[in-house]
Amino acid sequence: MSVIAQAGAKGRQLHKFGGSSLADVKCYLRVAGIMAEYSQPDDMMVVSAAGSTTNQLINWLKLSQTDRLSAHQVQQTLRRYQCDLISGLLPAEEADSLISAFVSDLERLAALLDSGINDAVYAEVVGHGEVWSARLMSAVLNQQGLPAAWLDAREFLRAERAAQPQVDEGLSYPLLQQLLVQHPGKRLVVTGFISRNNAGETVLLGRNGSDYSATQIGALAGVSRVTIWSDVAGVYSADPRKVKDACLLPLLRLDEASELARLAAPVLHARTLQPVSGSEIDLQLRCSYTPDQGSTRIERVLASGTGARIVTSHDDVCLIEFQVPASQDFKLAHKEIDQILKRAQVRPLAVGVHNDRQLLQFCYTSEVADSALKILDEAGLPGELRLRQGLALVAMVGAGVTRNPLHCHRFWQQLKGQPVEFTWQSDDGISLVAVLRTGPTESLIQGLHQSVFRAEKRIGLVLFGKGNIGSRWLELFAREQSTLSARTGFEFVLAGVVDSRRSLLSYDGLDASRALAFFNDEAVEQDEESLFLWMRAHPYDDLVVLDVTASQQLADQYLDFASHGFHVISANKLAGASDSNKYRQIHDAFEKTGRHWLYNATVGAGLPINHTVRDLIDSGDTILSISGIFSGTLSWLFLQFDGSVPFTELVDQAWQQGLTEPDPRDDLSGKDVMRKLVILAREAGYNIEPDQVRVESLVPAHCEGGSIDHFFENGDELNEQMVQRLEAAREMGLVLRYVARFDANGKARVGVEAVREDHPLASLLPCDNVFAIESRWYRDNPLVIRGPGAGRDVTAGAIQSDINRLAQLL
């Protein structure tokens, strides 16, 4: 087990802030506000040097050896900048103390420069901006009432000098643990970018070293999440400065992020992700200027990739070309060079392999090309090395992109007429790259983004359940399919119809208007495992499970559906009303994989009750109570029941008309109403268990088991009981209704109540549902939603509504 895997500090998080997030007084105060809102005591911060401090230090260092007057001017600019920051953020007495410490540092660094520059002096001077940032940020947090301490990472991070220094986890871990226990309950502000070698010298951690040190420190400290705050909200589908309709990606697979970083995207660096790969850390990218405007979370998700997620480009790349002599084995030479580059940790962005010309081409950014060329030159391999500059690169990144024929085709289409030097795809199929002889690439990236991401997506739909609701939805979908596609820009394909025993499946799509007729003749018996394998191998951009069953077995598969990247639209209430632990697991699984679980059809059929409750909560309201008639079936029964027809005969009529659940006892038992109440209460933000609801069942105990026919044949007891209750209510001038109630104190019940004839719950049309929402905003005059709450048409319409909503989310 690695040191990282052993580290453990449950709940602790780490926040990293870059130089642009600490550029001035306002920025520091904004960061302090973020820490107040988004962090807890014992959380950690890693900070970069403020603003352009690092560049100023490099300038000062270089000029100190050639132009002492200019060096002094840079030093004074740096001094004014840091002193202005300190004075603008702290009270005079505390500011004086920090300014004194800063001036002392500056004088010591100046003395170092006078004695000459070597690697150790360079690192000591250039890495000092982080020390000043951490010291000042700690003081600002304390001033804001957030107990904090600062920590110089050189006290525990151990790394030896190299082109890409690697932190020695074995040496660093115990040193950090000793320091962590010394500051209980405080936010620890740690310097980024710097470490120390065994000789006691400062070692810089290289390009993007602060981000790398943040994830490395987070892994050593055992944090649950590292959030990198910068001036962008996360990873976009393209550079938003080049592509105006680029969209923020809320979730990115770790392998996709790693490939994007390998391709030198500015928002990510490959070394930043190394500690994430070897630990259980979740990595989040967020904007410090607009923290509530979305983010990108990088996780180890199970959802299968189906194509490109990002297009990226570079307008300044180089090619190192190696001409293998005709007398040498070309494949052997390629293998040897590949091993040399891997050992030196300078992997190329792309490789051009030209067997016919005995030519190898290695693509690098201009910053890395000279180092790679030097490494290959020093290797002394037989052959000719040369460097070509001024080339460009475009790439598509996404798990499965090279296996997506549509995306590949559009990539090649966009490259037509372009000066392509060579194309390349990564071994794991996550990227497709083209190196161009000339740039710029902006118009090419715009066209590629438009072609890949705004073109029509194919959405596969698999319908589980072909009874009343399923058959009616098929009719509705057949009518609306073309309109839906035109409105959303997606192609919706009915890929399958499944019942409890058989399935009719086709990747090419089924005709919804004739699917049921074909089902009877062509459906085959299929076990659960083979059906699941068929679904996992789907060719669509997204697959949606439509669950219009009342099956517990299917509800139990929602976790698997989420983990394999399927969306679920449900009229089945069993998952939404399961115990809290299972319910949270399902919700978390869909959130983690970036898939959606929509269930508007579970309550109120087509009425927008779930949406309304969710909108009130999201807008800042608090739900105090919810009451009403939640069952269109029971609404119809109690409005029809006047004593002239036996109650069970009315139940039979409702069953024949498709107004009830497949087993009408599910309605009469109150379980269906209870599930709706639990779903609504949870939507309102309350943690309620199904067994907390007091339920009055109308099903006699001796009829709970057995067949439906047995229930209808033995309904005398229920009929007699209902007549007695009806007569008792009439004597008081009241009417009977089956009512559900829940309040903020956790009291919940469903059952028969006698209410006044002028009560909102009394004056209904048959099959109507009524929902009365009392909230902080609607305390004196409850918000009432009323309308048809049972029947095939309205429930099928609710399923269709959620398909529309899913299209918007996608």
From Swiss-Prot:
One of its GO terms (molecular function) is homoserine dehydrogenase activity. NAD(+) binds at residues 469, 498, 549, 791. A sodium ion is seen in the structure; a metal ion may subtly affect the relative position of the nucleotide-binding region to influence enzyme activity, and could increase the stability of the enzyme. InterPro entries: AceGlu_kinase-like_sf, AK-HD, AK-HSDH_N, Asp/Glu/Uridylate_kinase, Asp/hSer_DH_NAD-bd, Asp_kinase, AsparK_Bifunc_asparK/hSer_DH, Aspartate_kinase_CS. Residues 253-463 are annotated as: Interface. GO terms for cellular component: cytosol. Pathway: Amino-acid biosynthesis; L-lysine biosynthesis via DAP pathway; (S)-tetrahydrodipicolinate from L-aspartate: step 1/4; Amino-acid biosynthesis; L-methionine biosynthesis via de novo pathway; L-homoserine from L-aspartate: step 1/3; Amino-acid biosynthesis; L-methionine biosynthesis via de novo pathway; L-homoserine from L-aspartate: step 3/3; Amino-acid biosynthesis; L-threonine biosynthesis; L-threonine from L-aspartate: step 1/5. Residues 464-810 are annotated as: Homoserine dehydrogenase. NADP(+) binds at residues 468-469, 501, 549, 573, 658, 661, 791. Keywords: Amino-acid biosynthesis, ATP-binding, Kinase, Lysine biosynthesis, Metal-binding, Methionine biosynthesis, Multifunctional enzyme, NAD, NADP, Nucleotide-binding, Oxidoreductase, Sodium, Threonine biosynthesis, Transferase. Residues 2-252 are annotated as: Aspartokinase. NADPH binds at residues 469, 549, 573, 791. Bifunctional aspartate kinase and homoserine dehydrogenase that catalyzes the first and the third steps toward the synthesis of lysine, methionine and threonine from aspartate. Homotetramer. This is Bifunctional aspartokinase/homoserine dehydrogenase 2. It comes from Escherichia coli (strain K12).
